[in-house]
Amino acid sequence: MISRRTFTGLLAAAAMIPTAGFAADMPAPFDNAGDVKIALVRYLSTGDFFQAYLSGVEKQADAIGVDLRVFDSRQDAALQADMVDQAIALGVDGIIIQHGLTESMREAAQRAVDAGIKVVAFDVDVENAAIPQVEQSDRDLARLALEAALEDNGNEFVAGYVYVPGIAPLDRRDETWVGVKAANPGINEVAMFGTLDNPIANSVANQARAVLSANPNITVMFAPYDEFAKGVKIAVDEAGMTDQVSIYSADVSTADIAMMREPGSSWKATAATNPAVVGEVSVRTLAMLLAGEDPGASVIVPPTLITQAMLNELDIKNMEELGAKLPAFAHADVATPEWMPLPAR
């Protein structure tokens, strides 16, 4: 568990800047923000997306000035539920549940609500009307990526599909894939595979090697999570099939950008939100609840389509340049009441 506290009021007074006056205008309990404790309880943490998400959570917590505790269950569902109970026992004011399984999180989330704690869920359906769901608009992520696949390859192709059921964002992306296949009967899905075993990319690469060997006629791989796409690309490269197979994915990171921009790369497009921005929105949504405001049952962060051609044309090499050259990617005007301080840009 990581513990951190930001003494915003003391820093503002020492620096003699107007931040302290701004903080005084914040609603309770943020008029004494350093006394507010929130917890981030994570199910998934491996990979660039989750590191960036955590960075966004930390930056927004810093901007508000709250005490953030981070619990990482490392894909242990029972441990994640226990960590919610640990956060309750610590007397936190709010909890962000990041990913997880509905069956293990449903009762744990309800225990937190029963204890008077405000709860927000990101990409896990805890089936609780009192808990807002922060989403990346996963159906739109899948739709944008698949529209690119259809534009590049037509509506008749042989496809491989990477999917692990039971994870809310992947399930929502799967709904879109099922719909696209139904609307385009010329799409022939010959293989579905996937794993969340760590390291995810290497584990998926092992599966993809076997899939490509058994199905050398595959021309499109839909891998709607960037760690899946990394694994598929490893296998495609090793099989010498970069000219034959095109990969379409969801999510993005600096490492992904580098792989997409490799000469002749098979990774053609990804649809993504900025994971750091999603982390910021998660904290802001929780802060609104704590201030007695209603962020809505569903808080949606809109995605952007990022193509290999776009990255090359704009010479984008990392996430910082992506945000600078695509401003819509750098910030989401979501959960931003007037009193809410934002991280420095």
Predicted regions and their residues:
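Absolute protein N-terminus
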Residues: 1-2, 96
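N-terminal export leaders
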Residues: 4-8
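N-terminal signal peptide c-region/cleavage motif recognized by signal peptidases
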Residues: 18-20
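A residue-level marker of the well-folded mature domains of exported/periplasmic proteins
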Residues: 23-345
